[in-house]
């Protein structure tokens, strides 16, 4: 799956091949997991997936921004933002390192 955008359908297909559930069950499983993550984040909870990372909802306060074209100040209202913080394991995997901080010889 490298080099492209992975969709829900791609995740469902991967579950189908690797776990052995039917395509319908695989799609339902992926949908349920994503729905649960969304529900938790919408209620302000942190979602932590071991060896993957954490999804955290943070509050941003009111501030003054500026229109880059006109220079006019614009009030930016307080809001909630979602932040993803990858685990060290995921960072190492992305950078081609194994758990000991050494490059894999693939």
Curated annotation (Swiss-Prot):
Pfam families: Bac_DNA_binding (PF00216)
SMART domains recorded: BHL
Matches recorded under InterPro entries: Hist_DNA-bd, Histone-like_DNA-bd_CS, IHF-like_DNA-bd_dom_sf, IHF_alpha
Recorded GO CC terms: cytosol
Record keywords: DNA recombination, DNA-binding, Transcription, Transcription regulation, Translation regulation
Ranges in a coiled coil: none
A Gene Ontology molecular function term of the record: structural constituent of chromatin
Disulfide-linked positions: none
Subunit and interaction comment: Heterodimer of an alpha and a beta chain.
Function according to Swiss-Prot or TrEMBL: This protein is one of the two subunits of integration host factor, a specific DNA-binding protein that functions in genetic recombination as well as in transcriptional and translational control.
Listed NCBIfam families: PRK00285.1
Annotated protein name in UniProt: Integration host factor subunit alpha
Species, as recorded: Methylobacterium radiotolerans (strain ATCC 27329 / DSM 1819 / JCM 2831 / NBRC 15690 / NCIMB 10815 / 0-1)
UniProt lineage: Bacteria, Pseudomonadati, Pseudomonadota, Alphaproteobacteria, Hyphomicrobiales
């Amino acid at each position: 799956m490298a080099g492209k955008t992975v969709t829900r359908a791609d995740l469902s297909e991967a579950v189908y091949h690797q776990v052995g559930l039917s395509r319908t069950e695989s799609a339902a499983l992926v949908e349920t997991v994503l729905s649960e993550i969304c529900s938790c984040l919408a209620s302000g909870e942190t979602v932590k997936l071991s060896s993957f990372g954490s999804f955290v909802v943070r509050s941003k306060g009111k501030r003054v921004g500026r229109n880059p074209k006109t220079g006019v100040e614009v009030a930016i209202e307080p809001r909630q933002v979602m932040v993803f913080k990858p685990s060290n394991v995921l960072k190492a995997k992305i950078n081609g390192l194994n758990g000991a901080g050494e490059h894999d010889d693939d």
